[in-house]
Curated annotation (Swiss-Prot):
Positions contributing to a ubiquinone binding: 92
Associated pathway: Carbohydrate metabolism; tricarboxylic acid cycle; fumarate from succinate (eukaryal route): step 1/1
Gene Ontology molecular function, alphabetical: heme binding; metal ion binding; ubiquinone binding
Subunit-structure text: Component of the mitochondrial electron transport chain complex II composed of four subunits: a flavoprotein (Fp), an iron-sulfur protein (Ip), and a large cytochrome b (CybL) subunit and a small cytochrome b (CybS) subunit. There are 2 developmental stage-specific forms of complex II which have the Ip and CybL subunits in common. Complex II from the free-living larvae (aerobic environment) acts as a succinate dehydrogenase and is composed of the common subunit Ip and CybL and the stage specific subunits FpL and CybSL.
Record's protein name: Succinate dehydrogenase [ubiquinone] cytochrome b small subunit 2
Organism: Ascaris suum (Pig roundworm)
Residue ranges, Mitochondrial matrix side: 25-44, 90-104
């Protein structure tokens, strides 16, 4: 007696699962392009190199207080924060979890936060003592 024709409760559940699996299975086409939109390995490498490049940048910025160093440090921090927040949003604010509308709002808010942070830090660099001098003042307390 075959498992599918059996009328026990386990066999019925198994048949129902097979029917559900047949209805919900999706075939994903495989892209043959060398760099597809879904390939994030290059982006991941750039993020890692960027983070590694910030290791000598931060101590150097402590000793060099120029507007150019302020600008470089500002861009480095803003990009690092942007990629971090974008990663969190892409992991936890998926449309499947929170809905399409909230997922779009979350993705848009990442860019809004990034623009506000960049504008604020550039304004601070131009109208006040600058980022590197401010860090030195904080550490001298």
């Amino acid at each position: 007696m075959s498992l599918i024709r059996c009328t026990t409760s386990k066999a019925l559940k198994f048949r129902q699962l097979l029917k559900m699996a047949a209805r919900t299975s999706v075939t994903t086409p495989v892209s043959r392009e060398p760099f597809s939109i879904e390939d994030h390995s290059l982006h991941f490498k750039i993020e890692r190199y960027w983070a590694a490049g910030m290791i000598p940048l931060i101590p150097t910025a402590y000793f060099i207080h120029t507007p150019a160093m302020d600008a470089v440090l500002t861009v480095a921090i803003v990009l690092h924060v942007h990629w971090g927040i974008a990663g969190v949003v892409s992991d936890y604010a998926r449309p499947f979890v929170i809905g399409d509308t909230l997922a779009r709002v979350a993705r848009a808010s990442v860019y809004i936060i990034t623009v506000i942070l960049l504008a604020s830090l550039l304004h601070f660099n131009n109208s006040d003592v600058g980022l590197t001098k401010a860090f030195e003042m904080v550490w001298s307390l």
